């Protein structure tokens, strides 16, 4: 049972030219989504850890919490995960939970990342999907 979830908001996806919404709006929208679930903490950590690298955020949480880390991503991100800074180290330090995204299952299962990852640290979650991107979700 998870005791706490940390939803780390980034200024922007490094693989996209720009973000459709500003940071303050995204944080506000995320807090609205979680409602009164006190175990979910929404935060912007880049200023605290002085980095926008995922591996540095994971190291920060690991040192702070000394607990098992589950890293959640969409199947669309798994396709390009091998391009992330220190992606192999991230996969060694975390259990990676991948949520299927419409149109990405086959691509993600055939990706360089999927072929190279240790499958015991990787769980692929399928669920009733809605064909909507995270950018579209934020506009709701």
Roles of regions detected by a PLM:
Residues 1-140:
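Nucleotidyltransferase catalytic core that binds NTPs
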């Amino acid at each position: 049972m998870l005791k706490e979830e940390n939803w780390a908001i980034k200024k922007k996806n490094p693989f996209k030219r720009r973000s459709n919404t500003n940071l303050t709006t995204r944080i506000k929208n995320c807090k609205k989504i979680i409602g009164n679930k006190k175990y979910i903490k929404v935060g912007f950590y880049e200023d605290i850890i002085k980095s926008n690298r995922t591996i540095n955020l994971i190291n920060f949480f690991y040192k702070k919490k000394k607990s098992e880390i589950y890293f959640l991503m969409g199947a669309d991100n798994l396709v390009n995960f091998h391009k992330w800074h220190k992606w192999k180290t991230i996969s060694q330090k975390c259990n990676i939970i991948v949520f299927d995204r419409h149109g990405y299952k086959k691509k993600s299962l055939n990706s360089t990342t999927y072929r190279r990852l240790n499958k015991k640290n990787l769980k692929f979650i399928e669920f009733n999907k809605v064909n909507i991107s995270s950018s579209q979700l934020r506009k709701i």
